[in-house]
Amino acid sequence: MIQPQTYSNVADNSGARKLMCIRVLKASNRQYAHIGDVIIAIIKEAVPNMPLKESEIVRAVVVRTCKELKRDNGMIIRSDDNAAVIVDQEGNPRGTRVFGSVARELRQLNFAKIVSLAPEVL
């Protein structure tokens, strides 16, 4: 579960390293974001000499959370960290690589490009 003021890692090579969530999209009073949700975040830590800079406001898709995700078949998916992939307005990833595993639910939520870049799909 990611709420405003939550720090998360960036799971791509766009140049950012840490994000801080400032808003959960898709609902007016929704408090938490789960896997597959789009958030608005601020870049808190970035790699030098890259296109994305610190204190820049970006959109990101949550790909891993510490809070478990329960599937209909009884499987539970849990990660060691909160991670997100930075996307543009159309939902395409800004980076060219995705690090770490992503959940299969992203494919059903029309983030197939993120799933195709990921090395492991759970």
From Swiss-Prot:
UniProt keyword annotation of Plastid present: yes
Top-level taxonomic group: Eukaryota
Coiled coil: none
Entry's localization field: Plastid, Chloroplast
Xref: Gene3D superfamilies: Ribosomal protein L14 (2.40.150.20)
Keywords: Chloroplast, Plastid, Ribonucleoprotein, Ribosomal protein, RNA-binding, rRNA-binding
GO cellular component, as recorded: chloroplast; cytosolic large ribosomal subunit
Chief localisation class: plastid
Single biological process term from Gene Ontology: translation
InterPro entries documented for this protein: Ribosomal_uL14, Ribosomal_uL14_bac-type, Ribosomal_uL14_sf
Molecular function terms, GO-annotated: large ribosomal subunit rRNA binding; structural constituent of ribosome
The UniProt record lists the keyword rRNA-binding: yes
Function: Binds to 23S rRNA.
Known partners and oligomeric status: Part of the 50S ribosomal subunit.
Protein family according to the UniProt entry: Belongs to the universal ribosomal protein uL14 family.
NCBIfam families: rplN_bact (TIGR01067)
Protein name: Large ribosomal subunit protein uL14c
Lineage of producing organism: Eukaryota, Viridiplantae, Streptophyta, Embryophyta, Tracheophyta
Gene: rpl14
